[in-house]
Amino acid sequence: MSFIVDSGKCLGLSGQSGSGKTLLLRAIADLDLNHGEVSIKGKKRSSFSGPNWRKKIGYLPAESKRWHSSVGQHFDNAENFSPEDFGFSDASIIESEVDKLSSGEKQRLALARLLSGLPEVLLLDEPTANLDPHNTNLVEELVNDYRNTHGAAVIWVAHNESQLVRVSQTRLLMKNKSLLSNEN
């Protein structure tokens, strides 16, 4: 399979569960063994060390499992994290224990942690699956603002076609681990 996501653009990726969407994101992020080639701005993944590649690629899994005990431990510099920007009404969230957060709060925290690393590419696997409509809109706006401000390329996986129409410029459909169609 072959496709291009230009800097500052978002590709929406849909398909049934098990069609290979997450496998594709994990392969691009170099988290699983794969045989393809991926490039960022013309530089092949093979020219980077694994850690340097993963600094350029921000992967947000459908459910983040790697957490420090407190929210604040996820941010080297708390100035990079504005809780209000991510829908937290109380700035004291930085002192909170992660295991006391709801799944939606953890999802927004995972996005904040991801964006604080300033990746050039965002790989978002169902980034709004655990969110209410208000926070879904908030995340869509945050990613759009980040994409526009930093020129990041984004691959956004979702089952919600209307969401993909809102957030992406190009949409692809996966079926049986293959790209089937390109809808504009």
Predicted regions and their residues:
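Hydrophobic anchor residue at the start of the ABC signature
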Residues: 111
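Helix-to-loop junction immediately C-terminal to a conserved catalytic motif
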Residues: 28-29
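Q-loop/switch helix immediately C-terminal to the Walker
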Residues: 56, 63-82
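Catalytic Walker B motif of ABC-type/P-loop ATPase nucleotide-binding domains
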Residues: 122-126
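Conserved ABC transporter NBD signature motif
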Residues: 33-46, 53
